[in-house]
Amino acid sequence: MDVYQDIWNGSFPELITNPSVDRNRFFSSYMQTYIERDVRDYQGTTNDLKFYKFVRAVAVRTGNLINYEDLARDCDIDRRTAQKWLDTLQASGLVYLLPPYSSNLTKHIIKTPKMYFLDTGLACFLANIDSPEALEASYLNGSMLETHTLCEILKSFWHNGENARNLYFYRDANKKEVDFVLEKNMTLYPMEAKKQHCRAAMIVRIITFSKN
């Protein structure tokens, strides 16, 4: 299966196992239930329309550094509300915040986390991407591929009963960047998500180097 088909499908079992399910209706119902039940459990009453707009704003920024000012401006809310709402998305399992790698030897690095949607199918729905072909042609194809890669890495941790506390990304002030960095046994394992066009498949390039 082409990687963009896989990304667009997402990971909801109902959509994968039953092709007859109306995708748009499913995600619309999911978001309505999520806001009316889950979000109110975390933060009480909220402006549903603005919160939905906020979730969409996060979806089109998946794989990007958190910028509360941009989110607040686009959704006509203040920075404090943007931070509170992103915390809710994280706490409810809709979004994952990936921390930057840092050590005593890395002084000129970006210290802001990146935010990722934990289901790329839902992210595509919220971004109004209506097919795998539209996804591959869109400006979001790179960030969605990166998001998909992170989701697969996280699943490998969780399925083995492990957490991902040693997983990071790297970016310095000169914009040199590594998509993901795993720290294990005093060794860093940088990983880059790339599209292998000749076989329409996703590959992860892993380079190993010692912390020392």
What residues fall within each predicted segment?
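Interdomain motor-coupling "hinge/lid" segment immediately C-terminal to the ATP-binding subdomain
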Residues: M1-V60, N64-L65
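AAA+ ATPase "lid" subdomain C-terminal helix
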Residues: L15-V21, R80, G93-Y96
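A short alpha-helical element within helix-turn-helix/winged-helix DNA-binding domains
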Residues: L65, D70-A72
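Helical mechanochemical/support elements of P-loop NTPase systems and associated helical scaffolds
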Residues: N47-K50, N67, D78-T81, L118, ...
